[in-house]
Amino acid sequence: MLIEVSYFEGGYIRKISGYIHKVDTNEQYLHLYEETGLFKIRLSEITEIKCLT
């Protein structure tokens, strides 16, 4: 399932699209596969998640 994640970084809202690899509840990260590889986002920085497919 392809998703778009909006997240807060450096005072701006950024967006990234990809596929969920895993949610690490111990470290509080979302691991996301995107075009250039694996991307990690802190759960506390996520502002919105949309399903694209």
What label would you give each PLM region?
Residues 1-53:
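Conserved RNA-binding domains used in RNP assembly and mRNA/RNA metabolism
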